[in-house]
A protein has these predicted regions:
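Accessory carbohydrate-recognition regions in carbohydrate-active enzymes
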Residues: 24-433, 439-489, 497, 502-523, ...
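ATP-dependent phospho-/nucleotidyl transfer catalytic cores
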Residues: 494
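Long, low-complexity, intrinsically disordered segments
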Residues: 781-789
Length: 789
């Protein structure tokens, strides 16, 4: 067959596949309830793609710290009551904050100002509800509040939240509670100060300063109502106030135009109305003027905002069309939805935002984003965005990261940041792989020199996480810094990504320096035990050593030696050699998955979930491990393990995620894996081939091309890959290059009942490792980047 003929046939096949999938809307398959139970920590409420406002119900805000873990997203599926609806939430985080500006509608004459007890109906403004009267769709949420006789509907634009409240009886007076005392992880003393004012035009504005996960966080709000106010009260419930000053007009009255304090709750009275009440809301981390501007940035009533946001979700989600059994279709569609919630817009419509220095800055020519859970999301979430979103999304992310470094009091890139404020959560300088991966894929629109300088600054900031010792010794010593084993290997990977970007930019001096540091993982590898271990300042490994032990602040970060023993993504081939070769590596991988945990107790470790032996899918350090068989010449074993993981860890139910979704990382893992490939090493420009879990998929790439993925004979009886074809040509290696994905066409898997042990088993067929002779995939040049989008 001639090349021209082969290309024409491939194009025709792609056209047929696209036609077959065109009727399948991914938007219609999404179920935002997935992950709202169990350990998923997702929320069901209304949000636009990457929206600043996440308008969602909170079922319990009174719990504190560790007791609050299950309510990190505000909502928990098995809770019997809803306390109210607040404007800010994390999706899938393992810690929490937010839950700002909680509102609750009430119909009737009794208007309590306290939330009450969930176990005592009628004791406060919280209300019982029934899941049968609850609806969650992308950009829309509704529920009937049984105790108040009110149907509440929520929708949201990028910077606007819209609520519509309808009383069961038009003769009942309607009220709205706004509780500025409420927050997620709402321990005593969290609310430092709050204010509220009723402006002459009827707009309600205010600000709140909190001390929570992010210290000294300021957030302002603005509200407008679709019906006139009949009355209001701004109440302070603060006790033991040492000095009250002088009362203003209406001494002692709560019907004042403004109030400030540490414990404020507001009541708005509308009287009996014969139509639904719509409440428009917006937030700003800058000031009240910013919130008011955001309030006006998206005109229209509830239905108009809902229609606009649903259209945005259709466009964002329908870049991927899938054909699969219904449970898998729902799981993958919802995974893509969850992957498009963060990093969230954090700048006002005029470009202003609050940075890590707590000062106001201006984003010119881009949208400032925040909510960076980088320890989680560098792995698959950010690589996924490069193939399902326009390049401007990743460009905005990089510009936001670099701007944050420029405004950081410490002069480094974000670690775990939200609303521009740093939390210092987790380890590593994982903004580096995010930036390097984007740059090497040809994404531009940012200052590459400033980005590289920011990466180097973060990797050489001695006070951070033992970096001073790391630069001096080549490892982080455990007797000077906790979680030293994890930090050593994660720093080494981040160093490799800096070297990769520097080399692509012609900065050979930086490339050589950080390329050498990329080998520092060897300093924590114990050849005797075959594990990554923590060393002391005297060079000895810390004892006693138990590879199954998990304790916070110990040698490892949210894991143990079994999980961290595999974290050398920049040079897995070298790790295979260090472990004794292919057979020894395969045996050790099998031992990990088949480990007997019956005598172990991890109940004290809240992030340890989704165990398959010592493989822990509910937390990120294990996410690449199933793909490592391919580095030892056994891709068929990767295929078997992936089937085991997907079938046990993902279900289309509220408790369908085995662990925290972590701002889209758990979900991005499933999207990639379902399509048949995964970015084990971001910034390598390669994806390791696994096996598909969908019969067909059509991916509309950001450059205008389409990649159609077909899995022939895919069913439970055919779990193994027999052959792989890309645009009619056999793929006999265990990886795909990024440029091959972006070129589009047809990727066809033929599945079979028995393993094809010969496929991609040769050493030359293995994915990239730094110590390999094979040349890595070349970075996408600027000219090609323009053509590829």
């Amino acid at each position: 067959m001639t090349t021209l003929h082969r290309s024409a046939v491939a194009a025709l096949l792609v056209g047929f596949a696209a036609t077959a999938l065109s009727a399948q809307s991914t938007f219609e398959q999404v179920d935002p309830m997935i992950g709202t139970g169990g350990e998923g920590h997702t929320f069901p409420g209304a949000v636009a793609p990457f929206g600043m406002v996440q308008f969602s119900p909170d079922t319990d805000t009174g719990c504190i710290l560790r007791a609050c873990y299950g309510h990190a997203a505000g909502y928990r599926y098995d809770d019997p009551t809803i306390q109210g609806f607040s404007l800010t939430h994390f999706s899938g985080a393992g810690h929490s904050d937010l839950g700002d500006f909680l509102m609750m509608p009430i119909a009737g004459n009794d208007v309590p100002l306290e939330p009450g007890d969930a176990g005592k109906p009628g004791s406060g403004y919280r209300s019982r509800y029934d899941h049968a009267a609850e609806t969650a769709r992308p950009g829309y949420y509704s529920v009937v509040l049984q105790d108040h006789g009110v149907r509440a509907e929520l929708t949201a634009g990028t910077r606007v939240g819209m609520a519509r409240y309808r009383a069961a009886s038009s003769t009942q007076p309607m009220h709205l509670i706004l509780d500025l005392r409420s927050s997620l992880y709402n321990y005593p003393g969290k609310i430092l100060w709050s204010s509220i004012r009723l402006r002459p035009d009827g707009t309600v504005t205010g600000c709140r300063q909190t001390r929570g996960w992010a210290p000294d966080r300021t957030l302002c709000f603005a509200l407008r109502f679709s019906v006139p106010l009949r009355g209001h009260a701004f109440v302070s419930t603060e006790t033991d106030v040492a000095y009250k000053g002088f009362q203003g007009p209406g001494r002692g009255s709560d019907a004042v135009a403004e109030r400030a304090g540490r414990a404020l709750v507001a009541r708005f009275d509308f009287g009996a109305v014969d139509r639904p009440i719509e409440v428009r809301s917006a937030i700003s981390s800058v000031d009240e003027a910013g919130a008011i501007a955001n309030l006006a940035s998206e005109p229209g009533d509830f239905d108009a905002i809902r229609a606009k946001t649903m259209a945005a979700w259709r466009a964002a989600l329908d870049v991927l069309k899938i054909e699969a059994p219904a449970p898998m279709q729902t799981s993958v569609a919802t995974a893509l939805y969850h992957a498009l919630l963060a990093p969230a817009v954090a700048g006002d419509v005029d470009g202003r935002y609050r940075g890590p220095d707590n000062q106001v800055h201006h984003a010119q020519g881009y949208t400032f984003r925040s909510t960076f859970s980088l320890w989680d999301t560098f792995r698959a979430e950010h690589p996924l965005l490069t193939i399902v979103q326009p390049p401007s999304t990743s460009s905005d992310i990089v510009r936001s990261l670099v701007a944050s470094r420029q405004h950081s009091p410490d002069g480094i890139l974000p670690v775990w940041q939200f609303q521009g404020r740093e939390t210092w959560t987790m380890i590593g300088y994982h903004a580096a792989p995010v930036i390097a991966d984007a740059y090497l894929k040809g994404i531009r629109g940012f200052d590459a020199d400033a980005a590289l300088a920011a990466m180097v600054a973060s990797a050489t900031y001695a006070p951070y996480g033992g970096l001073g010792d790391y630069m001096k010794r080549g490892y982080v010593p455990i007797d000077r810094e906790p979680e030293a084993a994890s930090k050593t290997v994660e720093y080494a990977y981040d160093d490799w990504t800096i070297a990769r970007m520097a080399r692509a930019m012609g900065r050979t001096d930086i490339a050589a320096r950080f390329g050498q540091r990329a080998g520092n993982w060897r300093n924590s590898f114990d050849a005797r035990t075959g594990f990554i271990r923590a060393r002391k300042t005297d060079g000895t490994f810390r004892v006693p050593f138990d590879p199954t032990a998990i304790n916070y602040g110990s040698d490892y970060t949210e894991g143990n030696a079994w999980q961290y023993g595999w974290f050398v993504p920049q040079d897995q081939a070298a790790l295979v050699r260090a472990l004794g070769g292919d057979a020894a590596t395969i045996a050790k991988l099998d031992a990990m998955f088949e480990f007997d945990n019956s005598k172990l107790d991890y109940s004290h470790a809240e992030d340890i979930a989704g165990l398959i032996g010592q493989y822990i899918h509910g937390n990120e350090p294990s996410h690449h491990v199933a793909y490592l068989y391919s580095y030892a010449g056994a891709p068929w074993r990767t295929q078997a393990r992936l089937k085991q993981i997907v079938e046990s860890q993902y279900h289309p139910t509220p408790d369908g995620l085995s662990g925290n979704d972590d701002l889209g990382q758990m979900s991005a893992w499933l999207v990639f894996t379902a399509l048949g490939f995964y970015p084990v090493t971001p910034a390598s420009l390669e994806y390791v081939i696994g096996r598909p879990f969908v019969n067909r998929a059509m991916l509309a790439l950001p450059n205008g091309r389409r990649l159609t993925i077909i899995a022939d004979r895919l069913d439970d009886g055919h779990p193994y890959v027999g052959t792989v074809m890309l645009n009619g040509r056999p793929v006999t290696r265990a990886y795909l290059r990024h440029d091959e994905i972006m070129a589009g066409g047809e990727l066809r898997f033929t599945m079979q009942s028995m393993p094809n042990t010969a496929w991609a088993a040769g050493r030359a067929d293995r994915p990239y490792s730094a110590s390999m002779v094979r040349t890595p995939a070349k970075p996408v040049k600027r000219e090609l980047a323009k053509r590829l989008g």
